[in-house]
């Protein structure tokens, strides 16, 4: 009996001519963020133009963009350029951030290992932490002058306490079972610190560093407002004296970019460090002490 073959086109399977269903366009998080930024900037520009808001009060976005482009196009070697003032402020931020964070972390390590010392220092740390640092800035400038040293000292003061407090909390938050497990394996105090306490404290330390990064930018501008010869804070004061509000907003953008870059670098380092951390000692079958 001969088999009957289906005729071409008689099968129910779709051919290449069948139109494919189109998937709905979906925007990612970054696309939505960019779209929101465009809408906000467009609304800003349109609102200022429609309501005839004076430029010295709220400049249009186009004026801010022109001022920013003019500042970026200037020679980086000119002492009145945006690049020169930015380099001064970035130097102050980095020096103050690293010095203040390092001191806060070092003292946090020592204090967390000595409960009695922590109890003695706790009221003084609380009192100094609640002290408004902006009010102390003029005194620091009087002590250290208008140079970079006074700004670094102000930034150190602002970044010291977040790292100190979070590092102490992190070293105290270690699981006691991990300590007991390592001690049962005859681990030395240094090995306990390296394999249990320090890994447990890392998330707390990075949280303090992220807060300190934001405070570092604020501290640099406060110090330059109080007394400085160069820096973005000085540039803002000069532009405000000339009623150049668009130029001031362009400096605000540069400061925001500096803060974003610093926090992004910290976040990348945090992801890399925490990703390559050894597994929890309590969950390992063997611990190489």
Language model regions located:
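Transmembrane alpha-helical segments of polytopic membrane transport and secretion proteins
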Residues: 1-36, 264-289
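Periplasmic/extracellular loop-to-transmembrane helix junction in inner-membrane transport proteins
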Residues: 22, 50-98
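Hydrophobic alpha-helical elements at and bordering transmembrane segments
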Residues: 82, 86, 90, 120-127, ...
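Transmembrane-helix boundary motif in ABC transporter permease subunits
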Residues: 95-125
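Generic hydrophobic transmembrane alpha-helix motif, especially the helices
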Residues: 126-162, 169-170
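Transmembrane alpha-helices
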Residues: 153, 157, 190-223, 254-255, ...
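Short cytoplasmic-facing helical segments at TM-TM junctions of multi-pass membrane proteins
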Residues: 163-211, 232, 236
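Hydrophobic alpha-helical transmembrane segments of polytopic membrane proteins
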Residues: 233-270
């Amino acid at each position: 009996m001969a088999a009957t073959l289906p005729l071409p086109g008689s099968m129910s399977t779709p051919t290449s001519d069948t139109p494919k269903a189109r998937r709905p366009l979906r925007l990612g998080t970054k696309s939505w963020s960019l779209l929101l930024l465009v809408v906000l900037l467009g609304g800003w520009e349109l609102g200022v133009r429609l309501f005839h808001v004076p430029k010295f009060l709220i400049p249009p976005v186009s004026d801010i963009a022109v001022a920013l482009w003019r500042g970026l196009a200037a020679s980086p070697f000119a002492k009145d350029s945006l690049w020169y003032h930015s380099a001064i402020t970035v130097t102050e931020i980095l020096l103050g951030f690293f010095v203040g964070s390092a001191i806060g972390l070092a003292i946090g390590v020592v204090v967390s290992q000595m409960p009695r010392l922590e109890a003695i220092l706790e009221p003084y740390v609380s009192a100094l932490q609640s002290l408004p640092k902006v009010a102390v800035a003029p005194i620091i400038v009087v002590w250290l002058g208008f140079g970079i040293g006074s700004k670094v000292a102000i930034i150190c003061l602002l970044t010291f306490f977040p790292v100190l407090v979070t590092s102490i909390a992190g070293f105290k938050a270690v699981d006691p079972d991990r300590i007991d497990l390592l001690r049962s394996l005859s681990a030395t105090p240094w090995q306990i610190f390296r394999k249990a306490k320090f890994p447990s404290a890392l998330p707390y330390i990075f949280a303090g560093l992220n807060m300190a990064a934001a405070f570092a930018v604020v501290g640099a501008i406060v110090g330059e407002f109080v007394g400085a010869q160069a820096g973005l804070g000085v540039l803002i004061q000069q532009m405000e004296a000339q009623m150049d509000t668009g130029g001031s907003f362009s400096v605000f953008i540069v400061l925001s970019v500096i803060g974003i870059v610093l926090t992004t670098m910290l976040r990348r380092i945090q992801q890399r460090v925490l990703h390559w951390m050894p597994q929890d000692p309590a969950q390992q079958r063997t611990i190489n002490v």
